[in-house]
């Protein structure tokens, strides 16, 4: 740090003028007393253009990085809080949700919150996920226990043949035809999205439609409130770039929609014939069939 700046920090501290306005004002007066040739090119050029500024942002934050107590004083004088809850409207394009934020939807309003401020988002010490509006404790960190979630190809390879575990997913595909089941293997991102939401405590009901030779998936939630945690959102948004992902509400049911914008580039070899035989042998209960039919009617109303 330049000698003139460091000495002036001591001056500001000793005189008790440690607020951000005083810091900038004092440092600015100190910099003006330095010969023009000793100033940085950026500050000099701004003064030549007739702009008036206390000090450059680079110098200001350099000071705060060396004197943390001044940074604390600066934060205390801020009038606008850094962490806020932002109201969102439906339908919501989830790509507009900034990293580090979660989404909470309820009959009382919809908001995007900072993950570390949210009581429903998992923490390292006490990882929880939300099922509806109720937190559900998980055994260990979801990502540590499911490293495959970081890769669509790996997750699909490990789960495509687990037909019983993903019974609802495959029965919903089969409600169209076996050809649609085979078509889903060309879009591994669909099973991946369903797996991510199940891993983070949700009970998703996937409903499929076909458009331009590709499958669109709408995941329905049978809850009065829906919380999409920051980690789940980042996994979906970062690993599914070929899908437009949005959240909406229809007939008091929340829907997360996955619309393909480009064909999936990942080509994962799985035993298609064996999987299709297992899917054909699945038992579809009357309750499951009714849920799929009602879900299809709801999706058609979107």
From Swiss-Prot:
- InterPro entries noted in UniProt: Herpes_UL31
GO MF, one annotated term: zinc ion binding
Q: Which domain of life is it from?
A: Viruses
* PTM (free text): Phosphorylated at serine residues in the N-terminus. This phosphorylation regulates the localization within the inner nuclear membrane.
What GO cellular component is one of the record's annotations?
Answer: host cell nuclear inner membrane
Q: Which Pfam families match?
A: Herpes_UL31
ZnF locations on chain (CCCH-type): 102-227
Q: Where is this region: Disordered?
A: 1-22
Q: Tell me which Gene Ontology terms the entry assigns under biological process.
A: viral budding from nuclear membrane
Coiled-coil residues: none
UniProt keyword Amino-acid biosynthesis present? no
* Keyword annotations from UniProtKB, A to Z: Host membrane, Host nucleus, Membrane, Metal-binding, Phosphoprotein, Zinc, Zinc-finger
Segments of skewed composition (Polar residues): 1-17
Is Phosphoprotein there in the keyword field?
yes
Report the locations given in the UniProt record.
Host nucleus inner membrane
Relate the assembly described in the record.
Forms a heterohexameric complex with NEC2. Interacts with capsid vertex specific component 2/CVC2; this interaction directs the capsid to the host inner nuclear membrane to initiate budding.
Query: Could you say which protein family the record assigns here?
Result: Belongs to the herpesviridae NEC1 protein family.
| Purpose of the protein | Plays an essential role in virion nuclear egress, the first step of virion release from infected cell. Within the host nucleus, NEC1 interacts with the newly formed capsid through the vertexes and directs it to the inner nuclear membrane by associating with NEC2. Induces the budding of the capsid at the inner nuclear membrane as well as its envelopment into the perinuclear space.
Record protein name field:
Nuclear egress protein 1
């Amino acid at each position: 740090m330049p000698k003139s700046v460091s000495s002036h920090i001591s001056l500001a501290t000793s005189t008790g003028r440690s607020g951000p306005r005083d810091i900038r004002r004092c440092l600015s007066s100190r910099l003006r007393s330095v010969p023009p040739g000793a100033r940085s090119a950026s500050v000099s050029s701004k003064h030549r253009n007739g702009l008036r500024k206390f000090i450059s942002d680079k110098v200001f934050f350099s000071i705060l990085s060396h004197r943390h107590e001044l940074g604390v004083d600066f934060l205390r004088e801020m009038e606008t809080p850094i962490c806020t809850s932002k109201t969102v409207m439906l339908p919501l394009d989830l790509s507009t949700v900034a990293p580090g934020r979660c989404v909470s939807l309820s009959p009382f309003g919809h908001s995007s919150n900072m993950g570390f401020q949210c009581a429903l988002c998992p923490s390292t010490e006490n990882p929880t996920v939300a099922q509806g509006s109720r937190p559900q404790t998980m055994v260990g960190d979801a990502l540590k226990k499911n490293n495959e979630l970081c890769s669509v190809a790996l997750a699909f390879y490990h789960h495509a043949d687990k037909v019983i575990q993903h019974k609802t997913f495959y029965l919903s595909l089969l409600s169209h035809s076996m050809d649609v089941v085979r078509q889903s293997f060309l879009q591994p991102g669909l099973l991946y999205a369903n797996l991510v939401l199940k891993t983070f405590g949700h009970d998703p009901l996937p409903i499929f439609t076909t458009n331009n030779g590709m499958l669109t998936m709408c995941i329905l939630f049978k809850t009065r409130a829906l919380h999409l945690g920051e980690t789940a959102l980042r996994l979906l948004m970062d690993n599914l770039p070929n899908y437009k992902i949005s959240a909406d509400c229809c007939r008091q049911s929340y829907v997360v929609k996955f619309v393909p914008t480009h064909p999936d580039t990942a080509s994962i070899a799985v035993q298609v014939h064996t999987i299709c035989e297992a899917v054909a042998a699945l038992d579809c209960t009357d309750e499951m069939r009714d849920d799929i039919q009602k879900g299809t009617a709801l999706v058609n109303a979107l």
